[in-house]
Amino acid sequence: MGGRGGRSHGGGSRTAPQSSRYDAVERLARQMGIYLNVGSLQRGNINPIYVNETLNSIQYIYTHFPIMTGRVQYIDAETGSSRAYASAGGDGGLHMGLYGRLSERDLQRQWEWDVRSGFHPQGTKPSGIFIHEMGHQIEAYLNARDYGNAWSWGKTSSEIVLRAARKIDPTITGLRDPKVYALASDISCYAVSKGSHGQYPWQVWETLAEAVQDFSSNDMNAKPLSIAIWEELKRRARR
């Protein structure tokens, strides 16, 4: 759930990484209690730098959300979608997609295009892709803690997005108020993704995840709703 979208179809070959680089990220993952299902990394198809950046993103969230420490169980680079940068589920797993397969040059070029077009938040970089996915992991944890089902996508995020929006504009009547959509779309186009979302006007879990990456990259220069979501998410996590 929560695939991080990418819209270019460019590819790129890699040179085989040195075994020492692989050993370093493997040691770091082991220290963090994370299983690496990245066999292709050893075959030169996955850049160890990407794995290291993923681990750094996880540690960033652990630092700011201590309740998440140890929640990520594995990183998988073998079964991730080739149509999204990455994805996350409610089972403590993170999956590499395009993020693990594109060359560094092609990944940077694609990401810059996504940012210029407004598809992803301004000021963000490819290295923060898994910050977005950790936003989904936080929601999964809160869903499980508060409602008994990690996979109830939208349950927690809809509440957080609405509370955050009302901090900005107390006159907002509900999640379907056009003013909420306007605030969310100011973060990015992906923050108001349409799709399978049941009772929600859009995929509000993507609003939350995009806000997490926006704030982690831009701090108090992030969009107003991103700042409010980050603050509300931290408040909720401290319950």
Label every PLM stretch briefly.
Residues 16, 22-57, 66-239:
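Active-site-flanking segments in enzyme catalytic domains
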Residues 1-13, 209:
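Non-Sec secretion/translocation targeting segments of pathogen effectors
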